[in-house]
Amino acid sequence: IMSNYNSVTPEFIDELKTLLGEKYVKTDADTLDRYKTDEEADERCFHLPDVVVIPADAEEIAGVVKLCNKYLIPLTVRGGGTGIVDGAIADKGGVVLLMERLNKIIELNKEGLYMVAQAGVRTLDIQAAAKAENLLYAGDPSSSDSCQIGGNLATNAGGIKAVRYGVTRNQVYAVQIVTPYGDIVDLGSPLKKCSTGYCMEQLVIGSEGTLGIITQVTLKLQPLPPYKIDMLAIFHDPMAAIGVVPQLVKAGIDPTSIEYMDNPNVRTTSEYLEFPGAPHVEDGIYVIITIETFNEDELDMKMEQASDICEAAGAVDVLEADERIWSMRRNCLESVSLISKVCTTDDVVVPVDEMSDMIQYIIKTVAKYPFPLRINAHIGDGN
């Protein structure tokens, strides 16, 4: 409740500057305006913070938390700002705390197959550091080029590889957090098996800052499959497109990704990215399938098997997908700006076997209203 908080005072600002240094305490109008929204940029949800702080480490974050408690000032933590549900917006004013200076990879253990990183490291940089050692960090949200690993944990982010490797919580050994009281606590450890007490690190993952501020993470790594193919299966019937998912899984193909774009998405993203030559742009529904293996013969076999399954299910074409196709998938949300300044985004998860029912329901329901509809999905995991 707003009345439980106090307004920011000059004394509070002065204490922040003493703690962090004047350079890292921002109250100018341009900075405050920059952090009034997240990726959705819905004007109805704009909220200006009173002050933006940029701490360097967990100790400074703990100090900020203690000061906010002392003065009863609301505190909002912001990672990459790529969310679309207002989680990084200071709806009660107060402090927005940026994680951008906590941007170091502390350790990459090739023998133990884990990485220790600060929470402000970009997910793309986590992936690149692992790949440089022929290892894989399997978390891969669509916004990996700009989101931060701490935000991935805070929201239990999914992504394009979840069908094979699981979501963010499946990639985490341990976390360090600053509690709401300003204590620094380490939870979990890089052990394959640990039956000592509760798995508190798993409780923190997905808690969206309500249990503490994630400052450091220990991530699982695994060998990087050397052989890979990206396939594009093109359908005209959305139910046929969705129907290939259980068939691919039951066939033992073990795809890394199965992504879905309806035709309105295909048309809008191709225009947004100036890619008029996108395959079947006028009528195609896209299913993007990634297969990765440790054996070239196995890759060839699974690729042929997947192609046969798609064609039998009604695919009008099965092609090799290049980076332009993946760019279309990653830009589904951004491309909506071509058709409307206002966009309502819903993120729905259902059991995989109910995916077709959900999409049919969405199409039928929205058809009652004069709104354009775009559907994209991680259909391999029901999201």
Model-predicted regions and their roles:
Residues M2-N6, V51-I54, V116, Y165, ...:
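Hydrophobic alpha-helical scaffolding
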Residues Y5-I13, I54, A58-I61, A119, ...:
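Generic structural signal for well-ordered, non-membrane alpha-helical segments
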Residues P74-V77, T82-D86:
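Active-site cofactor/substrate anionic-group-binding motifs, chiefly glycine-
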Residues K104-E259:
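FAD-binding subdomain of flavoenzyme oxidoreductases
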